């Protein structure tokens, strides 16, 4: 096993997240060892480098919406460390993201975004969290069961325990299975936006306006979902 001295969490993520994830600091270090071993054995992983923990760079205390994905896009050049998001340079959007944008325009009446970059959502308090934070290129689900689930489960539990306004958007069976981690958090649930399931309950589900209504019921400001 290729091992290295783990960096303190406060050096690799926002301080509130470092405190929230301290109970799984050892697991995060183990996942670092796992990724180094993958590289040592000639395999790569997505997203690259610091983007693995990118979801935890925005302030923990400012998260108002949790949007759960499964694992990163396996297509090289797509995964950026935020669930469903891609870099601004990606012109042909993944099918799930295209469907998210179709529902966004129908739900909110906004024009189609100019790119698939969801960074503005993250900066406004949407935690774009994949349940599994890495993947082998072109092999969807390849890092499931390797240890990331313990990390992201702790992230969800910590958010739910803050006692601050929060809404979870759970698309698909995998995301809905996380409901027991946050029994008191209002949730917007539907089918997954994947092309295989979007017509079975995702389209027409109005997740963005429903999330805002649930935020307002908690006395919080609605989320500004507009994208450039």
Swiss-Prot record:
Single GO molecular function: uracil DNA N-glycosylase activity
Reaction catalysis annotation: Hydrolyzes single-stranded DNA or mismatched double-stranded DNA and polynucleotides, releasing free uracil
Compartments it resides in: Cytoplasm
GO BP annotations, alphabetical order: base-excision repair, AP site formation via deaminated base removal
Keyword tRNA processing: no
Active site: 71
SUPFAM superfamilies linked: Uracil-DNA glycosylase-like
A single cellular component GO annotation: cytoplasm
Keywords attached to this entry: Cytoplasm, DNA damage, DNA repair, Hydrolase
Main location: cytoplasm
InterPro entries in the cross-refs: UDG_fam1, Ura-DNA_Glyclase_AS, Uracil-DNA_glycosylase-like, Uracil-DNA_glycosylase-like_sf
Disulfide linkage: none
HAMAP family associated with the record: UDG (MF_00148)
Its biological purpose: Excises uracil residues from the DNA which can arise as a result of misincorporation of dUMP residues by DNA polymerase or due to deamination of cytosine.
Family listed: Belongs to the uracil-DNA glycosylase (UDG) superfamily. UNG family.
Protein name stated in the entry: Uracil-DNA glycosylase
Native species: Thermobifida fusca (strain YX)
Gene this protein is translated from: ung
